[in-house]
From Swiss-Prot:
<feature type="region of interest" description="Disordered">
    <location>
        <begin position="148"/>
        <end position="167"/>
    </location>
</feature>
<keyword id="KW-0874">Quinone</keyword>
<dbReference type="GO" id="GO:0048038">
    <property type="term" value="F:quinone binding"/>
</dbReference>
<feature type="binding site">
    <location>
        <position position="110"/>
    </location>
    <ligand>
        <name>[4Fe-4S] cluster 2</name>
    </ligand>
</feature>
<feature type="binding site">
    <location>
        <position position="72"/>
    </location>
    <ligand>
        <name>[4Fe-4S] cluster 2</name>
    </ligand>
</feature>
<keyword id="KW-0479">Metal-binding</keyword>
<protein>
    <recommendedName>
        <fullName>NADH-quinone oxidoreductase subunit I 1</fullName>
        <ecNumber>7.1.1.-</ecNumber>
    </recommendedName>
</protein>
<feature type="binding site">
    <location>
        <position position="65"/>
    </location>
    <ligand>
        <name>[4Fe-4S] cluster 1</name>
    </ligand>
</feature>
<dbReference type="GO" id="GO:0051539">
    <property type="term" value="F:4 iron, 4 sulfur cluster binding"/>
</dbReference>
<dbReference type="InterPro" id="IPR010226">
    <property type="entry name" value="NADH_quinone_OxRdtase_chainI"/>
</dbReference>
<keyword id="KW-0830">Ubiquinone</keyword>
<feature type="binding site">
    <location>
        <position position="68"/>
    </location>
    <ligand>
        <name>[4Fe-4S] cluster 1</name>
    </ligand>
</feature>
<feature type="domain" description="4Fe-4S ferredoxin-type 1">
    <location>
        <begin position="52"/>
        <end position="82"/>
    </location>
</feature>
<keyword id="KW-0004">4Fe-4S</keyword>
<dbReference type="InterPro" id="IPR017896">
    <property type="entry name" value="4Fe4S_Fe-S-bd"/>
</dbReference>
<keyword id="KW-0472">Membrane</keyword>
<dbReference type="GO" id="GO:0009060">
    <property type="term" value="P:aerobic respiration"/>
</dbReference>
Length: 167
């Protein structure tokens, strides 16, 4: 049987050693970020919410080829294509995405859509605050994801489009 005084001294030494480590860590620099007071720093390869890109002329890069939707393993991308006309050109191709939705209830941020896009129209941005109490707000529309028109570029306007049946 061990000496009770040795046991008490051993326990006190272990507690003192643990408290020393604790106080040393308390006085050192913090490892965690001060979010939301300070913006987080992301690596270049961070996969945040999706962004639909425009070219230098302000036209949408998406040509509605559906390759991103086909590559998506969770089927969270929905696209409706429309033809570009002489009066209105929304993209550089024959078609443009009239409707482009991503359902973040299903998206797993795998990046397959970004890899599949031949025109680099869809990319991962650095946005990460997508949490919501309402799941219907997690379906992002094209208008929510498009980058602003570059300065000096004239954006295409849907107001010039001929109404259906008026041909």
């Amino acid at each position: 049987m061990a000496n009770p005084i040795e046991e008490i001294l051993g326990t006190a030494a272990a507690i003192a050693k643990g408290m020393g480590i604790t106080f040393k860590e308390m006085m050192g620099p913090t490892v965690t970020d001060d979010y939301p007071d300070a913006p987080p720093k992301f690596e270049e390869r961070f996969r945040g919410v999706h962004v639909l890109q425009r070219d230098v002329n302000g036209m949408e890069k998406c040509v509605a080829c559906f390759l991103c939707a086909a590559a998506c393993p969770s089927n969270c991308i929905y696209i409706e294509a429309a033809e570009n006309t002489d009066k209105i050109r929304m993209s550089g191709g024959e078609r443009y995405a009239k409707v482009y939705n991503i359902d973040y209830n299903r998206c797993i941020f795998c990046g397959y859509c970004v890899e599949a896009c031949p025109t680099d129209a869809i990319t991962h941005g650095h946005g990460f605050e997508a949490a919501s109490y309402n799941t219907s707000t997690l379906v992002k529309r094209k208008e929510d994801m498009l980058v602003p028109v570059p300065p000096g570029a004239k954006p295409p306007s849907m107001a010039d489009e001929v109404p259906a049946g008026a041909h």
